[in-house]
Amino acid sequence: MALPIRIDIVSDVVCPWCYIGKRRLESALQTLGEEVKAEIVYHPYELDPSVPKQGISFSEHMEKKFGPGRSESMFQRVEQVANEVGLDFDFSQLPKAISTFDLHRLLTVAYERGNQAETKEALLKAYFVDRIDLTQEAVLLQVLESAGWDKKEALEILKSDIARDSVEQEMNYFRQLGVTGVPFFILNNKYALSGAQPSETFVNALRQVIEESKPQVIAQADSCDLGSGEC
């Protein structure tokens, strides 16, 4: 019987390691198969709240943030690792650095709607693999439609303040917990893994949760044995 395990993931849509970590976790869950039944819940984290709503040039923003030499070598490594998990990253083709606050509002509502996983994957793929400009309303709505959204409903959320307080409160909560980088994984509200861990690390951590879920015998006395039938 599969053990139910809740996995809370603190992440940002524009974090490449969050996408890589997502793929590595998925690989781990595939390895475990029927040993676990995972409930995955995504939580908001803004890597750069200073980015304006209309976005800014990705290359210029990264050069300003890290310096031209460092950003280029850093992204080459990320592209290589992404390729190893089947993701086609090309940072030179990303049109914009974008604000993700509204995307987190959508993801918060998506959890209540039951399509958070689909929405998260669609947004990550659109940004990193398809490399499209998510600041364009029509484009974003098309992406959301592919994840099971009604365009009108999504637009109403974008035009409103729905889930704004929830997103801000969650981000404050995880900052207070000491989360300073993403992705950040919490297993059954007990164990935490920081960063895009290798799949094997996820497998080992999840198996530890499985082991600890089993009853621990703290005392033994006379009993009937199921195997031998003796009492």
Report each predicted region and the residues it spans:
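C-terminal cap of thioredoxin/glutaredoxin-like
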Residues: 3, 7-11, 20-34, 42, ...
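Cys/His/Pro-rich metal-binding microdomains
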Residues: 16
